[in-house]
Amino acid sequence: MADEIAGDDVLDAYSRVVSGVAEHLIPRVASLRIHSRRGDSSGSAVVLTGDGHLLTNAHVVGEGEQANAEFADGTTAQARVVGVDRLSDLAVLRADREIPDPPEYGDADHLKVGNLVVAVGNPLGLAGSVTAGVVSALGRSLPVRSGSAQRIIEDVIQTDAALNPGNSGGALADGNGRVVGINTAVAGIGLGLAVPMNQTTRRIIYSLLHDGRVRRAYLGLVTTPAPLRPALAERFDQRTALRVVEVIANSPAADAGLRPGDLVLAVDGAPLRDAQSLQRLLFADAISRRTEITAIRNNALVDVIAHPTELTDR
């Protein structure tokens, strides 16, 4: 009997957390109807700022420039697209009228596998839908493309909170109601993915708010993580580096003298342990900047100088 009561208490506590998060977030997540020359599409968006900005997925916006946002209380607002970044699958819109205050945004870097998460969105046109689950995995990678440009969205959150078409652009929140991710994809039954809220994402959002786009630097390398031999790992205090698989012809990396087979250890002294660590260094401030790349070639240490150009999607 005592065990049954204790179990009921746990379920009641779980329900209170989920309902509290839902009560806080539902008014702050809008149903979006995007208008474009190719027709209308739908999704969700989360209030981003107190002056009318909304955050959603780039694939929800598509080629549209205008949208209609409807909130849980039935109020609507026209919104225009402020900026789109297809290489992070994020977009920012601005409403033409006062909208609810934004929720608190958290940091996905503090999540752990097994943490409770709550998804709020508008799946299949059903506004204000709430599902709950746990963080199933962290550090997933989601490849994205814009024209000829490719990128990996880093540290994607995997959850078993049910996601369906229309959830895209909605909020994934922790048990305290802080938005830690933007729901982006349904990867299978019981498997959803969300773009994490972290330092890199915040930098992208800042660029979209202020510039309407995200400028990135381009080296022209195709790499894959590779383990370092124990002696090298101890010497450089890192276990992995990036093995160069391909150097794009006439690229900054080619001009610098990098070759397939090189093991890239660091850029400007910052260790490279995975593709994401390189991506984090290739934002606007790296364009045309003198960049020192440290690599191992035939067991010898090599330093080369590159001048990254601006990444384009053509």
Where are the regions a protein language model picked out?
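Serine-dependent protease modules
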Residues: 2-233, 238-240, 283, 299, ...
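A structural signal for short, hydrophobic beta-strand segments that form beta-sheets
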Residues: 81, 135, 244-247, 264
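Short, structured beta-strand/loop micro-motifs enriched in basic residues and often containing a Trp
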Residues: 98-102, 242-248, 272-275
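Residues at or immediately preceding the N-termini of alpha-helices
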Residues: 108, 198, 250-252, 275
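PDZ/PDZ-like domain micro-motif
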Residues: 168-171, 227-235, 248-266, 281
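PDZ-domain C-terminal substructure recognizer with occasional recognition of PDZ-binding tails
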Residues: 206-213, 243, 255-259, 265-271, ...
